[in-house]
Amino acid sequence: FCGSKPRCRPRCKPRCRSRSKKRCRRCRRRCSRIVKKCCRRRSKCCRRRRRCPCPCPRKKLRCCKRRPKRRCPKRKKKRCRRKC
């Protein structure tokens, strides 16, 4: 999540850890901790945008609409079909 640093392979670091601040989809607040998907292969660093630590009540981002079979990071046991 936003508080933890993204785990990246050495070849992914330049693409994944960009210095430019990106905006949270919902509240449009700029956050340097939002990380984009950095490489095509499935690995620990290849995750979609994380949530921004903003006080906005609608800060949660959609993680499972595009990949419904993927397990939700919050609910590891159950597969997430809604916003997580």
Swiss-Prot record:
Known tissue expression: Testis.
One GO MF term: DNA binding
GO CC aspect terms: nucleosome; nucleus
Keywords: Chromosome, Developmental protein, Differentiation, Disulfide bond, DNA condensation, DNA-binding, Nucleosome core, Nucleus, Spermatogenesis
Biological process terms in GO annotation: cell differentiation; chromosome condensation; spermatogenesis
Main location as per UniProt: nucleus
Purpose: Protamines substitute for histones in the chromatin of sperm during the haploid phase of spermatogenesis. They compact sperm DNA into a highly condensed, stable and inactive complex. This protamine condenses spermiogenic chromatin in a pattern which comprises fibers with a progressively larger diameter and lamellae that finally undergo definitive coalescence.
Record's protein name: Cysteine-rich protamine
Organism field: Eledone cirrhosa (Curled octopus)
Biological classification of the source: Eukaryota, Metazoa, Spiralia, Lophotrochozoa, Mollusca
